[in-house]
Amino acid sequence: MASFKRDLYLFLAVFLSISGVWSFSELFFIKEPHDVTAMRRDAVVLDCQAHGEAPIGIRWLKNGVTITESERVYSLSNGSLLISEVESRKDKSDEGFYQCLAQNKYGSILSQRARLTIASLSTFTQQPASIIVMEGSVARFTCKITATPPPIITWEFNRVTLPLATERITVLPSGVLQIQGVEQRDAGSYRCVAANIVSRRRSTEATLTVTPAMSPRAPQRPRIIAGPQNLTVPAHSTALLECMASGNPRPLISWSRADHKSIDVHKTKVLGNGNLIISDVNPQHAGIYFCRATTPGTRNYTIAAANITVLAPPSLVEWPESVTRPRAGTARFVCTAEGFPTPQITWLKNGEPVRSNGRIKMYNSKLVINQIIPEDDGIYQCEAENIQGSVLAMARLIVVMSDNRPSAPRNIRADTVSSSAIVLAWDRPAYNSEKVIAYSVHYMKAEGLNNEEYQIVIGNDTTRYIIDDLEAGRNYTFYIVAYMPMGASRMSDHVIQHTLEDVPLRAPELSLTSRSPSDIQVSWQPLSHKLSRGRVSAYRLSYRTSSDGTLTQLELSAHKTHQLLEGLQPDTTYLLRIAAATAVGWGEPSAWSSHRTPKASSTKVPLAPELQLESLNCTTVTLRWHLPAGSSSGLQGFKLSYHEEGQSEAAQAQIPPHHRQHTIGGLDPRKKYHIKLLAFSFMGDGYQADQTISTPGCVSVRDRLVPPPPPPHHVYAHSNSSSSVFLHWARPAFTSAQTLNYTVRCNPVGLQNASLVLYLQTAAQSLLVTDLEPNTNYEFAVRLHVDLLSSPWSPVVYQTTLPEAPSRAPVGVKVTLIEGDSALVSWKAPDDRSAAAVTHYTVLYATRRAWAAGDWQMLQREGSITMALLENLQPGQVYLVQVSASNQMGDGPFSAAVELTIHTDGHAHRTHGFSHATVFSDGFYHLDQRSMAGIAVGVCIALTCIIICILILACRSKTRKSCTTKSIRQAGGQTPPTAVRLANESAAESVEVMMPMMRDHFIDAKGGTNLIINSYGPVKPNIEKKRRKRWSFFKKNEKEVKKVSSPAYSYHPGTTLLCYTETSPENPPTTLQGLFGPSGGDSEGSHSSEGSHETSDSGRYSHDDTEATNVSIRSRPASLQDDGNQTPVHEKQLETTLQEQEMTDLHPV
């Protein structure tokens, strides 16, 4: 019973479809419009009557656009178009092509085209000209005019109409007047008259003058005065070939064909004396005709030739037939036409042009519709058209739909897997899903026109599929259809998804020329989307000389296609290459291209030709070029050379100067060739144009049928160590080959040097990549090789190698003594890019004796902290301090030991309050403001104490002031050690120098002014008035202070020196070092040693040349610097001398 019902349904479906075709066959045209020529203001009717199932609607189109009806132009009840008054103006004309469109419920059909032409008669384009001929010779007049319809031309002699043909006179339809055997009575005035339905026009008059003939006439060889002209004529029209010859005796005219075929005598006749007329021309009459003028009785002749081209309107040889197809089926229509020129085939659906897309394809004369949907139902027409007209044929496509068909697959999803793969997933149809026997996956590029649609059929056991043969960086459209025995479902919803970008497949081809001896013009063509594999984001142009390895690189924006390199060396060979990048990274650079700059003396030779290369096929390249303006003078030719990349350059071939094109054959497929072309003149060889081109592969059947394999899937990277990464991947699905090889690409992210890209080969599905840089982010990609085919690169994966333990110690280690038993250690992070961030620092410190015994104390600080406080230090000891950095990978090396001397209690007592010593690991001493930031509070307290002391000292007796000042001046005119400033402040910032501990008489307030303050107040040479206002509280001693200013002080701008004297020193200095600090020479120190010996100063000076100069100034008075071998002066005596000198300066006699 079920089988019977199924057969009944099929019978009804076929019957209904057949009846539908029969109903459709009733829609056709009874009358169609035809070409018409009308005069202005005439009424015109264009016929159009259609027959078919009612109701039938008719609408008109002019030049493909629907006509808007008006009182002047409107449709009649029978469908014809009436133009009551034809107009012909520049802004508004009724001329054009007209078609009518008939429509009923089955669809629409379009009529043939009809041309409406407005009759006209223009002025003459060629007037007859006066001539002088010899009696007995021939005469010929001609006139030409443009008119619609073609005019009838007659001639008048002395304003009397001539007969169209006599024994001696012939009037040709083309407007030519021929006179044979001219006589004296033929002399006179001639003019032509052209007339058609519009009007009549007369040409200007031309005079024929006849001269007497010589007696007897000398023999003359035959000469063709007016030979035949090439003709292009429509079929079924008349063709006229003129042939007029002169000679003595009168020549005989004969005709023949070049193909030796006989001339059709039934439709051919001779008009006048040798003019050939062919009536009712058809394609068989086309060909080359020879006119031969022969002297009678001799073999003397002359020949003229002309070609006749016959235009034939289109005619159908094979026309489409109506078909009935189920949903998701395929329909094919065939339409073949002939004519000349070859007709162009256009397909229409319901009167509208068919748009080619993924489902609908047009192959020459065929229309193929895949995956038919209900909307494809309609009337299809094939229109064959050329300049002679058009012809149409029609057929209907009926789409049959089954009631038991499944619904469309639901919830289609697309996810990008890689630059060439997208995975599709969907849900089964909601209706009749159990009857689904298969699915078809359809996809095509979303951008552009005429994209190919691809179809893949899979079983019903899955709702997921990976498409892995896509182009990188492209948008694709996907949809899915479900199939069951009775038919197919509707299409699913369309989804658009894009593939990932990849690095460019190759670099652009370079074109190199020079405009002068010191530049190179580099140009290139943008990469195609298939080669760029995404949007190009930048170019990198590299160049160098052939003899120098120094490489210059230029980063260029993506929109640039040329770059001028200037400032180059003349007569030098340069190597250039280019690389392109997408958002993913840089592709492989091109091979080096060489170009030699012209010699400096080559300024008058021809400039480089502008060269264009094109691959005709896999073994042939065509060169086209042209010279810049002004470079053709004196040109003697061109020189061409080419060679395959990596091969030696071949000999030059010379090309004639008038050639601008050359073909190179016999090349190898898939090879890169370097081509060089230059022009040469008598001045020498010109500038050279260099270009590279890659020949394509020869297309074979195998290339067309076998797609490239998919790339490996699931690439995974794992860091094994600081120099190795382990890679593994999965074999791509649907790859049945047994022998597979893989290429692994590895390079650092943001690579600047393409030579660092690693390419590793393996047959396994895993690889350990070694010899990598620590703590560096790398990118990896894998491609598959099978059967001489290569897959695209897999998606790029990123992995960072593990970092190393710090390989360098902290730098800038310094120790600052802030109290008698406390010191501040500070440092800077090590400069080690291969190591991870520092997690903590370790500070080791101990006395010399404990250090030697391995008994040291340790402090640890977090990686963000770069200072530590050492407390409970023992007085009178020398401490050694070292710092190291550590991270999660391990501990780094320790810095060089820094020595710090802790003073005894008595010494500390003499220091009075704040005193600091800064020690550097590199042996230099420096007052670093950043290190003082950590003890800002202490500094503020110290400054407050100093200000209080100054105010107290300002009130002391003048006797003590005089004594102090005098003692200083007698010391050789030098400022105390702490008053000497470094040569420049930048040196003080970079070369850190420890200042000796302050004595009781000298306090460095590190002010930003040039004041010198002793116990009596501020002292400044040539002090400015506005500066004195800031020290107004010292006005009572201002006069005496001015007297203190003396050359005895070594004055340095930007330094404030505070000088004071103790009221009653309990512990006077016992040595010279106690007053002036350590000696500048320090014979026991070395550049590499750090810290100081057990002395009252807190460190050792460097023996650096610049620093030694400053230190010697600080350490000794001028009286001791004159001679290094003088006997040391006792400190007590020196102090007394200085005090006496100071008293003398303050109280002059």
Curated annotation (Swiss-Prot):
GO terms for biological process: cell-cell adhesion; negative regulation of neurogenesis. It comes from Danio rerio. Residues 408-502, 504-600, 605-704, 711-804, 809-905 form the Fibronectin type-III domain. Glycans are attached at residues 78, 230, 300, 307, 460, 475, 617, 720, 741, 753. May play a role in anteroposterior axis elongation. It is found in: Membrane. This is Protogenin A. Residues 24-932 are extracellular. Residues 1-23 form the signal peptide. The gene is prtga.
